[in-house]
Amino acid sequence: NTKTIMQNMSDKILPINEIYTCLQGEGKLMGIPHILIRVSGCRLRCQFANSFCDTPYSSWKPEKGKFTYDDVRNFYEKHSHINHTMITGGGPTLHAKMLQELCEIGKKYYQYITIETEGSEFVSTMGDLISLSPKLSNSTPKPGTIMPYTGKVVTEKDKVKHEKWRCNYEAMSQLIENHPDYQLKPVISSEEDLEEVKELQKILGVPNNMVYLMPEGLERHQLNERRKWLTELCVREGYNFTDRLHIITYGDERGV
């Protein structure tokens, strides 16, 4: 019956590997307390100039899920003083029905919901802010190198899969058009990346004031190496700069 089906849905373990409270570390809402829901699984396999994906446990080697819808509800009730949620990954749009359900649950607890996505697939949700982090060519994995988290050699298959999903401009456009607000938040390794950002803006029709350029890095020293020239570039070109508050504060740690 319907009651049994609903109970089974509430008890089902979902592909969510982390739920915790934190300050938003990036973008226009940086510094605001959030409830973070991390979805496991991603279509991309990012490897940047000096670092791999900062959440390899949700991408290169995705962990199994640990939480249910009831766990999400209970977390909201326990932390009712926080009214912002970010659903991140991994790639949340990989699990469309669950993403929609998480947004519906969040809205019942009066949450302002940010969906952080690489933009590989369009999903219509009740989210408020699409935080779009399109991956530039600086993220393409390099076959033959070692992925530290897994200890395995990066393969040509990893590269092909990454490139297949990296630039889904149609999905990105639909995500922007079908949600109340958005921000474009690309990872920048070098000044040469700016040309790709400008091309992406041209394709998507995104003005500079909606773009937040973010320095690449998993550790403080890596951010420090890029912060000065990237802030100067933002001033010169008219972009927003976003730091990475969680890395500045804690380094490469989980659950922060």
Model regions: which residues?
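Conserved Radical SAM active-site core
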Residues: N8-T21, P33, L44, F48-I130
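Conserved AdoMet/S-adenosylmethionine-binding subsite of the radical SAM
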Residues: T93-V256
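A detector for short, charged/polar N-terminal pre-domain segments
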Residues: L23-G25
